[in-house]
Amino acid sequence: MKRPIDWREDRSAVREKVAESAHCVLPIVLIVVLLCLTAAPMKPDLLLSFLIGGVMLVVGMGLFSLGAEQSMTPIGTKIGTALTRTKNLPLILGVSFALGFAITVAEPDLQVLAETVPHISSTVLLLTVGVGVGLFMVVCMLRIVTGANLRWLLIGCYALIFLLAAFSDPDFLGIAFDSGGVTTGPMTVPFILAMGLGVSNIRSDRRAEADSFGLVALCSVGPILAVLILGFFYQGSNAVADLSSASFGSSTAIGGAFLASIPLYLKEMAISMLPIVAIFFLFQVTLLRLPGRSLAKILIGILYTYVGLVLFLTGVNVGFSPLGAELGAELAVHGWLLVPLAMMLGWFIISAEPAVGVLEKQIESVSAGAIPGKVIQRSLSVAIALAMGLSMLRVLTGISILWFLVPGYGIALALSFFVPDIYTAIAFDSGGVASGPMTATFMLQFVMGASSALGGNILRDAFGVVALVAMMPLLSIQAVGFVYERRAKRTAAAPEQYGDFDIVELWEDAA
């Protein structure tokens, strides 16, 4: 007799995921409320809409995380394994492109960025980034099959990126690098990793599993290249970012704004998720043929993902982000105090990201416990605090983002020659961990608000904050790996120490 789906277990999982997302969002909400009550006066209706948006964000992120875990990860693994069994390389590459495109278009962080960019149509940006990820999913699969070295692939890709950046429209620079950061979000990362692990089974050598790392790093390159190339051909509009202060007037108007937005996002997310669902059902009737219970669990996961995305985007766009921009504008009068304030927000953002815990366990496992999780968390907190400080420095001075990205990536790629390959792969993968939902939804709006209030160029000075946040873990994790590897080598080279109960031969008997 088939065991029915345990709904009590499902409810428990929902509560757990909502609690995780509350842990992620709550520190930012508390800091913002404290600032609104002391240093940055806000209209009560705007603060109330922010709090309602925060609740929707928490519930939406929780449902989405559970849904992605129950649907996107198993879909990626099962399709990857099924493709491997066919031994058909053109089919593997074609499906990888289609799935990379489809999963990216539904990525919530990318949806938020596309709505924020003023001079590029959101549809054009979504399609461009989707094509970029799809093409580099093909590159990822070829790398797994052939065992190509990740370091040299990354060096070649970033050399091409900075060559294009030197000649591209400055208005596209920050957006291009931000696109690479937000693409590796909570929808895309589990799917890419799962599919890569499934396809890596095509090889039986020791490096096969290690080569399944680094997929996120390569898929982050695709959107940057795609948007930079778009800048050479696309005539953007003259629109400017809409940072006008939201005003609701009454509590019923706030409720009306949220209720009016829900049908819009129900339609948008249905269109965005349709390709993923269609591809899955095509595989279900041809190669997978999952049993009823497994299929039902995946379908329930897809429903959770859909509802979570709708709540997430409604909460972000109606309530959460508008106050971020307004807060940045209010605090801009304090000038250079913006730098330490942004650093404090950066510290709390990364400390609260639920995906950081997964990264800590991954590195502890790879280092056989030599690198404690707390060391990784501290290094990431310092790195993201510095990234936010540098972002605000750009707003205050107008320095081009290339002055930070070129040396940053140069040092990160140079470090890859001095640490084991696995650390490089994990470090480049971890950029998506740092540039999570809080950076895309709140911090970008905060920086845009400050830039607008100071009379800066939002496209050139504010965009790029996600890129800096995504870059810093490449440096911090490899630096930690380098220090611990050196320490391990010194320990191995040290003379043997005798234990308390070892027998020590002081002389040898004459032969």
At which residue positions do the language-model features occur?
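Transmembrane helical segments that form the transport core of multi-pass membrane transport proteins
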Residues: 49-52, 246-355
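Helix-loop-helix junctions within the multi-pass membrane cores of secondary transporters/permeases
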Residues: 80-82, 89-160, 339-416
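Intrinsically disordered, low-complexity non-transmembrane regions of multi-pass membrane transporters
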Residues: 1-21, 25, 76-90, 204-215, ...
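N-terminal alpha-helical transmembrane segments of multi-pass membrane transport
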Residues: 1-94, 98, 275-307, 311-313, ...
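Transmembrane helix-loop junctions in multi-pass membrane proteins
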Residues: 34-48, 68-76, 102-117, 136-147, ...
